[in-house]
């Protein structure tokens, strides 16, 4: 039973609202009241500035990495033959925690940065490709949501191309769907031409 408690820890760590903590502790600001009202790195940059945005990004990516690591530890302790499945479960629980945080009444962020941390651990080559595409799309359009959806769509495609194990490919597909579904409101605003670009705003 003990090893599987680490998977529960992965969910709890994923649930930690990094953006909310950075905003409230260091800036006396609740990100949910400004900009896109999201607690992710993009809105942290938009409202609080680059250093805050970078801190939130690193923390959220770290949650994904740590979730997979805890899953790997669980597998190594319980049954090494199941390690890859435990790694995926740990990452998925961290992603679910980020998107449905126990500390935020089961609400949360979009899951992009945490998902990036997960695939960084599971599939670093694919992560480099996906991150490059994200940078290009965001650099050209200044629309983080568009870059995030494009990157999410690319995850299962690159995993298929590089012949990742089926459990990893299936996870990549599920994670991509979670990220895209979490961006449904952004997609509607994109179609309406109302989506916020990644630029600083003045708090009122």
Model-derived features with residue positions:
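C-terminal ends of transmembrane helices
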Residues: 19-22, 97-107, 134-141, 184-188
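Short, non-helical or kinked segments that cap or interrupt transmembrane helices
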Residues: 29-41, 103-116, 143-151
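Loop-to-transmembrane alpha-helix initiation sites
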Residues: 128, 144-151, 164-175
């Amino acid at each position: 039973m003990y090893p599987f408690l680490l998977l529960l820890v992965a969910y709890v760590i994923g649930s930690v609202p990094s953006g909310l903590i950075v905003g409230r502790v260091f800036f006396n600001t609740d990100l949910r009241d400004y900009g896109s009202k999201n607690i992710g790195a993009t809105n942290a940059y938009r409202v609080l500035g680059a250093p805050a945005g970078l801190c939130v990004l690193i923390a959220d990516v770290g949650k994904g990495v740590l979730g997979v690591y805890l899953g790997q530890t669980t597998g190594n302790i319980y049954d090494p033959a199941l390690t890859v499945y435990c790694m995926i479960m740990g990452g998925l629980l961290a992603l679910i925690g980020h998107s449905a945080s126990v500390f935020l009444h089961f609400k949360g962020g979009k899951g992009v940065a945490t998902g990036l941390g997960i695939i960084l651990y599971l599939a670093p080559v694919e992560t480099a490709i996906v991150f490059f595409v994200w940078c290009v799309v965001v650099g050209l359009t200044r629309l983080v949501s568009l870059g995030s959806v494009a990157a999410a769509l690319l995850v299962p495609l690159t995993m298929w191309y590089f012949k990742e194990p089926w459990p990893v490919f299936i996870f990549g597909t599920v994670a991509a769907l979670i990220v895209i579904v979490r961006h449904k409101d952004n997609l509607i605003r994109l179609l309406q031409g109302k989506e916020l670009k990644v630029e600083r705003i003045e708090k009122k």
